């Protein structure tokens, strides 16, 4: 008895899958080269995407887009989709992490004792740098200056919490 291993896919479904992959490839063309390097694309796909950015002729752009779609068929789209979702802010876990960082910043600015608690949770953090950023942020807010240190404090907390093991 003959058993078919693969599930039958209609021609319409195959075309839709190929168009979806090509659209995903086109999303890659909108990213900077530095961001593309972070994704860890296949060398051929990376070259095709960077070449697409340099092309000005409409016909050549269409051919290159189809070539990118062809290369995408040989590539696992899941990591690329996850990376793009993270860039767009669709990643729920990443959003939850950013909210925890924001809550930590609010606590540190509101309560002077919060820094001690934060340092016990993240002993590898630079207490002096955090203390300075907190002091400068409070001074900034009192003087209604642009939130330069407010943002710097967020970035520092984000870095510390990304590298730390404890949950805040």
Curated annotation (Swiss-Prot):
Gene Ontology CC annotation, any one: cytoplasm
Alphabetical UniProt keywords: Cytoplasm, Ribosome biogenesis, RNA-binding, rRNA-binding
GO MF term (any one): rRNA binding
Gene Ontology terms: biological process: assembly of large subunit precursor of preribosome
Task performed by this protein: Member of a network of 50S ribosomal subunit biogenesis factors which assembles along the 30S-50S interface, preventing incorrect 23S rRNA structures from forming. Promotes peptidyl transferase center (PTC) maturation.
Protein family (similarity comment): Belongs to the DarP family.
HAMAP family in UniProt: DarP
Full protein name: Dual-action ribosomal maturation protein DarP
Species of the source: Neisseria meningitidis serogroup B (strain ATCC BAA-335 / MC58)
Recorded name of the encoding gene: darP
């Amino acid at each position: 008895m003959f058993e078919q291993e693969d599930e039958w896919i209609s021609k319409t479904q195959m075309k839709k899958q190929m168009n979806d992959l090509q659209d995903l490839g086109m999303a890659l063309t909108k990213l900077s080269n530095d961001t593309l390097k972070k994704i860890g694309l296949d060398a051929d796909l990376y070259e095709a995407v960077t070449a697409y950015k340099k092309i000005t002729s409409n016909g050549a752009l269409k051919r290159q887009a189809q070539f990118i779609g062809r290369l995408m068929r040989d590539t696992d789209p899941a990591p690329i989709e996850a990376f793009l979702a993270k860039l767009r802010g669709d990643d729920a876990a990443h959003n939850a992490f950013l909210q925890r960082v924001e809550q930590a910043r609010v606590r540190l600015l509101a309560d002077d004792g919060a820094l001690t608690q934060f340092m016990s949770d993240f002993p590898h953090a630079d207490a002096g740098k955090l203390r300075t950023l907190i002091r400068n942020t409070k001074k900034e807010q009192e003087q209604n200056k642009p939130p330069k240190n407010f943002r710097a404090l967020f970035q520092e907390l984000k870095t510390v919490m990304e590298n730390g093991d404890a949950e805040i």
